Each structure stands twice: as structure tokens, then as C-alpha cells.
Amino acid sequence: MNYGVLGVIRLALDFIGTKIAFRKSRLIRFPIDIRGRSFIDFGSNLTTGRYCRLEVYPIEHKKGILKIGDNVEINDFVHIAARLSVQIGNNVLIASKVFISDIQHGCYNSNKMFNDCYPDIPPKERSLFAESVFVG
């Protein structure tokens, strides 16, 4: 690939930042937004694109987790959110602009098992639902 002078400088800075902040990773391209880092298990040789978001919001201080396997490649603008458990297996490639999550703000089907699942109720007022997710 031909990165050009500025591309090579940016790549070098990303590599240095990776080795300082994410020692087991292959290359983290900055900026990256990480929330709940203590609940994230990074595998070895992780590669990310730019502008990724990795977030963990545990339920009532229980240990929610985002587990990323070995040799995973996550492209630009990927958003992964976990409340209970999201696991990315080994050797997984995730395309750009992908959203992976184990949480949702209700459903919109004819089975109205929850009273707050109607589209006219704002998402922040609906119950959160979580179910474990595995990609791999």
C-alpha cells in the first residue's frame, strides 16, 4: 500500500500509541473511544481502524464483559456495546460501519409482552433488554 508521507507518519504514531496503551495488540488506529475498559478483555494481535467505539455498561455493577479473541481485525467506525456479554471469537474480521450489541430498547412486533415497547415511547424511557452475543 502507498500511504504517502503523512500516512506513514500517522501509522507510526498509531503504532507507538498501540505499544504504550494496548501492548498485546497489533495496531490500534486512533482515535478510538473506549468506555468501561476494565470490563473489556482484549485478545492478542488486535487490529482496529479509526473511530471505533468499544463500550461496556454492566448491569447493576455485575461484571458485564466484552471479550475480543486473538487475531481480530475491526475496521473503521465499528461500534460494539455490551451490557451482559459480547464475545468476538478468534480470527474474526469485522467490516466498516458495523454495530454489534447485546442490548436493545424494546421490540416492535405484534407480541406486546412488554408495555413499553411502542415506537411512540422515547427509547430512553423504555426498558433495556440484554442477551449474550457471540460472533465468531
Predicted regions and their residues:
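Right-handed parallel beta-helix
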Residues: G89, S101-G106, D120, E125
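Domain-scale signature associated with acetyltransferase and cell-envelope carbohydrate enzymes
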Residues: M1-D102, F129-G136
